[in-house]
């Protein structure tokens, strides 16, 4: 982590997002109804889904903090992928309803230009949601939290959708009343895409997809640079929520005693954790190198 208080931010960030989402839902909903902007009303429904998403994220973070037990010996970290998939599903469902309503409105031709105040409201929400995105993506990346990262992208999608609403409202006011409805369709397509991406990422995590090649190379290099390590014949890694888990099988000098081999393994574990802060579960299997290979 870049800063010591990144861990503290992890506990606070979702509450800030939850509060901001509630305020934005009410703000956009009321202003959308008063100004007659169907796109802004639809955007308020998107923010309403954000409120639910923030609540799900907060719950998943609490559960993922629980220590491993007999029922879940590998811990509760993967709950964050489930949380991320729920957020993605909410976005996808909301986008589908928004798309349907907007297309029906476009087909029927029942649209009219909203008040310019809708554009003012949309611009405020763009700023708020972009700030929340930047805050959450920083905390999520530093803590390696898929749930917080998913919530951050939820806010980014809200910021982009509000920007589309703002453009649509302005175009409607200056003489293109259909633009507000078209903006709503564009918003729904964007939100749906983000939802699908979050669901895809969650599936990869739950299916134990491999960590990035760069992380594997880092772990391999750190292990090989450890004194008395002769070679590595097996290495794999996966994400478990915020943590990274490695399985490493290495060979050491065949002349080492069992106690010394254990010390080498512990040195490898410590050095990898220093280099990769989120590598909290490292399984090491040590065996002696063949005598001929060791002499070579």
From Swiss-Prot:
One of its GO terms (cellular component) is magnetosome membrane. The keyword rRNA-binding does not apply. Its main location: membrane. Disruption phenotype: When both copies of this protein are deleted cells have no magnetic response and no magnetosome membranes. Deletion of just amb0974 leads to an intermediate magnetic response and still makes magnetosome membranes. Deletion of genes mamH to mamV (amb0961 to amb0978) gives cells with no magnetosomes and no magnetic response. InterPro entries: Cation_efflux (IPR002524), Cation_efflux_CTD (IPR027470), Cation_efflux_CTD_sf (IPR036837), Cation_efflux_TMD_sf (IPR027469), CDF_Transporter (IPR050291), Magnetosome_CDF_Transporter (IPR053436). Gene3D superfamilies: Cation efflux protein transmembrane domain, Cation efflux protein, cytoplasmic domain. Keywords: Biomineralization, Ion transport, Iron, Iron transport, Magnetosome, Membrane, Metal-binding, Transmembrane, Transmembrane helix, Transport. Residues 1-214 are annotated as: Transmembrane domain (TMD). Residues 1-12, 105-112, 186-296 are cytoplasmic. It is found in: Magnetosome membrane. Residues 34-83, 134-164 are lumenal. Residues 215-296 are annotated as: C-terminal domain (CTD). It is a multi-pass membrane protein. Disulfide bonds: none annotated. Induction: Locus amb0974 is part of the probable 18 gene mamAB operon. GO terms for molecular function: metal ion binding; monoatomic cation transmembrane transporter activity. One of its GO terms (biological process) is iron ion transport. The chain crosses the membrane at residues 13-33, 84-104, 113-133, 165-185. Signal peptide: none annotated. Forms heterodimers with MamM. Probably interacts with MamE. This bacteria makes up to 20 cubo-octahedral magnetosomes of about 45 nm in diameter which contain membrane-bound crystals of magnetite (Fe(3)O(4)). Belongs to the cation diffusion facilitator (CDF) transporter (TC 2.A.4) family. Plays a dual, essential role in magnetosome formation; required for magnetosome vesicle formation as well as biomineralization. Probably binds and transports iron. Requires heterodimerization with MamM for stability. The C-terminal domain (CTD) is probably responsible for hetero- and homodimerization. The CTD assumes a V-shaped, dimeric metallo-chaperone-like fold and binds 1 Fe cation per subunit. This is Magnetosome protein MamB. It comes from Paramagnetospirillum magneticum (strain ATCC 700264 / AMB-1).
